[in-house]
């Protein structure tokens, strides 16, 4: 079983590391090509392209400039510990045991605009390059055209290595669009998280993102390997709703706190 999650815009390169083990990203030749394109952008162009403030554009121009091909614990940190968004608040990888990291390294993948696919312990230099950004490159008009089948092929390698054919899609639509479902050698299961608001259940972005992290943690902590085991997920008040679910979609609901 392979879990897919999105990266985060917020990064943490300060907190103490909970493991010293690391691996290197497997698609760095591709990353280097994107860095080459990104370095051509001025801070104002970055600001417009990414719809971010001038200050953030300056920070990210510096990140593109400072990026180097040699990754070490001095200039990079493990991806699962560097990302700090809502998904990662739910995941809480900073509390993982070494055995948890082992299982995650086999069964969890982070999709990335710059790195393509990251394993949890892959070192990552800081960046911001969302998958949906229209960064023109030698392969096309955006990052989806740049990555083409590369991400899907890498996921197929991971599935083959574990002798499995199930992908748990906990990534956002923006990121999962970089995967070619018809070329993926797997059944795709998508957990959906609905929160009650004024008597109606709906997707509330902040809660849904955190729940994706909670579900990832649930799978890792309990060493789950079969999709039917996911129905036992009950973190922070969520429960499985069989009536609302289908073969490819597992629906979890949570009542509003009264």
Swiss-Prot record:
Q: Which domain of life is it from?
A: Bacteria
GO BP terms: namely: response to hydroperoxide
State a GO cellular component annotated for this protein: cytosol
Tell me which InterPro entries the record gives. Answer: YaaA (IPR005583)
Into which family does the record put it? Belongs to the UPF0246 family.
NCBIfam families in the record, alphabetically?
PRK02101.1-1 (NF002541), PRK02101.1-3 (NF002542)
Put simply, this protein is called UPF0246 protein YaaA
Which species expresses this protein natively? Escherichia coli (strain SE11)
């Amino acid at each position: 079983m392979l879990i897919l999650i999105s990266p985060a815009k917020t990064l943490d390169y300060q907190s103490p590391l909970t493991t010293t083990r690391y691996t290197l990203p497997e698609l760095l030749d591709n990353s280097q090509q994107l860095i080459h394109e990104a370095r051509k952008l001025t801070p104002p162009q970055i600001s417009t392209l990414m719809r971010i403030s001038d200050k953030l554009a300056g920070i990210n121009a510096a990140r593109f400039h400072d990026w180097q091909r040699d990754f070490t614990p001095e200039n990079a940190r493990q991806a699962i510990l560097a990302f700090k968004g809502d998904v990662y608040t739910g995941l809480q990888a900073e509390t993982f045991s070494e055995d948890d990291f082992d299982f995650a390294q086999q069964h969890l993948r982070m999709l990335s605009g710059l790195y393509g696919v990251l394993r949890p312990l892959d070192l990552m230099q800081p960046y911001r390059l969302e998958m949906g950004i229209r960064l023109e490159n030698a392969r096309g008009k955006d990052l989806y055209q740049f990555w083409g089948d590369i991400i899907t092929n890498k996921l197929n390698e991971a599935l083959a290595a574990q002798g499995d054919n199930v992908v748990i899609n906990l990534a956002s639509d923006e990121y999962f669009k970089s995967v070619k479902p018809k070329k993926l050698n797997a059944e795709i299961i998508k957990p959906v998280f609905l929160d009650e608001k004024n008597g109606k259940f709906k997707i509330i972005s902040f809660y849904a993102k955190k729940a994706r992290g909670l579900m990832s943690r649930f799978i890792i902590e309990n060493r789950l390997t079969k999709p039917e085991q996911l129905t036992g997920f009950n973190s922070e008040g969520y429960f499985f709703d069989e009536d609302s679910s289908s073969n490819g979609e597992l629906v979890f609901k949570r009542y509003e706190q009264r």
